[in-house]
């Protein structure tokens, strides 16, 4: 229901002959659908439908922006760039278009924001954090005023900055993460209902960096709860993944860590991000196999214990 005005704007635009505005409205509708966790398969079908319309009407600018979103989905769904899912040109966005776009601020910002999604999702946290260092935290807000992607971009850069701080031990990354966290907290205070799960995960990352494990665990669990309640499948997956990595690297609770990572892979796959799910499973295959081996040993031990009890009982009855 909240997206209905964008569909109405699309209809009004075509009825009045303002097809440019109509198609920009539908582009924003597609972006919101992505942010809200819509199934990637369903979203891809909508993108392809409206892209054909944009190209038929020769609306090049909005078609280019929509193509960047299409490229993002193609990579996530394992339909393109299988060898390197963070490469941001291919089936939907040609290398030539990509090179041209890099020289145009508005289009370049569009590429940067969706490319940043891939960098965070595929664990390229230092690269993502360095982009923030290069462009500044308000780059997207200055080049694409009022785009809803500002919320997600700030959140993902914050996650990557805290992750980069933990990977490198460099506190300046954590300071950048705190800048992103502070911005989101201000939005929450002003009544934005769409970023509370972002706030919770950044709280968890901040507490993890500070070594406050109990507080971090509570915030990770809150991020998972809020993401799940809101239907944000991708954010549920990311929060679960970050929680799993937190346990493996910081609390050394391998059982909980493996469980959370397996849940994350399941959530990624349910959303349609098969490339991401497979990447996560490959990266953690050793931990997964160790967990399976441990579970098997526990089962065998339990079986032996029960069998021994049974035979002891029979002997006792027979005596």
Task: Explain the meaning of each model-derived region.
Residues 39, 92-95, 310, 316:
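Helix N-terminus capping/helix-initiation residues
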Residues 41, 47-290:
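Helix-coil-helix junctions within alpha-helical repeat/solenoid scaffolds
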Residues 1-39, 45-58:
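Hydrophobic, small-residue-rich alpha-helical packing segments that form membrane-like cores
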Residues 27-38, 249, 283-296:
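Compositionally biased, low-complexity linear motifs
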